[in-house]
Amino acid sequence: MPFVESASQPPGRSRLIEGMVLALLVVGLMAPQTASVTGRVRDATGLPLAGVVVTLKGTDRFAVTGDNGEFVLAGVATGATLVASQPGFNPQDARVSNDRTTRLEIVLTVGGIRESVAVHAAEPDPPAQSVTTLTALDVVRTPGTQADLMRALLTLPGVSQIDEGTGLFVRGGDVSEVLVLFDGVVVNHPYRYETPTGGFRGAIDPFLTSGASFTTGGFSAEYGNSLSAVLDLRPLGRPQSQQTTVTAGLAGVSASFASPLGSRGGVRAAVNRSTPSLLFAVNPSPSDFDRLPGGWDASGSVTAESPRLGSLRVTGLSQRDHVGVELEKDAFVGFLHSDTRHELIAAKWQRAAGPRWLATISIGGDRFTKSTDVGVLLLDEQESHRSARAELTGGGGPWHALVGMDGDVVDTDILGHVPQRGGDFAGISGSERFEIAHRDWRAGVFGVASRSTGPLTAEAGLRADRFDASSEVTVDPRASVRIDLGGERSVRVAIGRYHQGPSPAYFDRVRGAQVLSAMSATHLVLGYERGTPAGRTFGRIEVYKKWYDSLPFEDDAGFSSDGYGSSAGADVYLHRVWSRLDLTLGGSVLHARRRWTPAEQRDRYTTPAGTWSPDFEIPYSVQAIARIPISRMFNLAGSWRTAAGRPFTPAIGAVQTVGGYEPMWGPINSDRLPRYERVDLSISALTTIGQRTTAVFFASVDNLVGRRNVFEMAYSADYSARRPVKSASPRAFYVGCSISITR
């Protein structure tokens, strides 16, 4: 039988690996007047095509053809449309008839460009942006990602991994410089188990989305308040049929449900609960816990469509997380306790404005609450973020235009005590009160115009933003050009100016800044491509340069905007598809320097003149991902990644005080940790029981060879000896099963 899959909601658990959520692709469909659809996909010569993805249009359900080109989808509503697609071929639609049992014969023709099937004004391919598009299937099929979108993005060229978390450090930029949008609404806290370097899991489950676009530099004037990158998440649309799925594994359990409401509405709901005790019983951790990491999340959405009023979608998400884990920092050893709550709501309305234009309005916000205690640090944090965006896009002939406005309001309240010296959780140098009551708002307007003439596509954009806290207006011009060289080859160039408001963490009322300017950056990107992302072979190489100004920098009064820096590098991405192998190779080189103080490192080091390597400067990284269909039932995937260790500041001595030993630090980030390397493996098996029950079994191994990667150094009490901090993620095994029933 052919290999059949479809999608659903995976458990929200930090140790949940991609094998588990691959199971969630199997969904049950329950709908009146359905058809059991079988068929064969072949090329123009009549030969069967294996590995073709046959998708039920407008849903997350799909099947994959077997060696003989055959596929089957049960419970498909009559009148529905299937879309068959495979790299190197043009996608082909097929409509399901009213017969109780339908068989389709689909022929794919050779081609290189995937046409849009979205029902709205078409947008041209961005001419000079570093854009990568991922689906939930891409995420779960990448070994070692634990079915997490942020971990999948860490495997891309240009993204540096500096610890065991999922923070996105893009092309020499800090994790805070990445803008995350969900249905046009800003997600101000896009990580779970949040840390200063991001977090240990993404807050948005990939199965809440129909896809994600990740732009690593040179992005257009459509996006503001970001210095480095943009992650734009698109939620699932209206369900076309009823779906239900239940999944269980070592890390947790989950259930999801989706159903249409009449012919123009629909609802989705999902709930996940982690079971950490079972996971850690099978995979003991070298780290000590007095409260195992755990939590739950629930999500839901409502969609309504009207030919006259347009479409409206409202999505809500609620999450709870907690952990109590032993922390080693400098000479301190103690437990870190954290409890978090996160709620997100996003609403999006779209309506055609004439035959060539589309109007879009997004509005929503997220609310984040967190309590943290470790050593002398004790903080209670509350932050609410509200954002809105309105756009009008369309055009005619060779012209395309986009105009709009956006804005957001952030209210931050933090109260507690922190070490006087950043990172001194033992309080050797003392502690002090920490209080933030900060409000800021930003409003922007933007316009982008592009024109294609022969092999040349040019784009020019301009945006202006008002930052209230700094009482300034910024103007950012941006431009890009793509030149087609023929033979599926092209050259891309982009240049632009970018601004972003500084983090509220710099505005401590005790020793923080009173006013900081908006940070700024200038991007220059030059790229070469051969092939197309939808083709059998695709390659991209990009070189870039970034200049930073007005970065926060510590001074006697707290912080000023006197910091600056730069980064330069190159990224390479290669993708090749054979009949029995899907191979992706990537690599990056990076040189970055900054004169800048992270908020949590205030008074930690003696700052020299000039610049130094930031914590996230990883000079090189290389990765390879291979996916192999063993048979119609079994699929195997493996990944390998290596990278230079991150820089760190060594302790070169200590001074004994009444409270203990205070470290004497060497030059900032003058040493480097050992090289990082990791191999991950996963396998899955899918079977059907009758026509209405599908089961998938999965297993995986993270860090297959058990390498002890080092992300931090700790010291003895007098700083006379140092040791690598134990990894919280050694070799880990996972098994589970997902069952879906079609009624």
Task: Give the positions of each predicted feature.
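Periplasm-facing N-terminal accessory domains of Gram-negative outer-membrane beta-barrel systems
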Residues: 29-127, 160
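Periplasmic N-terminal accessory/gating domains of Gram-negative outer-membrane beta-barrel systems
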Residues: 88-92, 98-105, 116-220, 230-232, ...
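Short strand-turn segments of transmembrane beta-barrel domains in outer membranes
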Residues: 198-202, 210-220, 227-259, 269-273, ...
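Transmembrane beta-barrel wall of Gram-negative outer-membrane proteins
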Residues: 250-273, 287-322, 336-359, 396-399, ...
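Structural signature of Gram-negative outer-membrane beta-barrels, strongest in the C-terminal barrel
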Residues: 309, 317, 393, 398-402, ...
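Membrane-embedded beta-barrel scaffold of Gram-negative outer-membrane proteins
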Residues: 360-364, 370-371, 484, 491, ...
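Gram-negative outer-membrane beta-barrel transporters
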Residues: 452-453, 457, 545-547, 562-652
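C-terminal beta-signal and adjacent terminal beta-strands/loops
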Residues: 633, 642-659, 676-678, 684-743
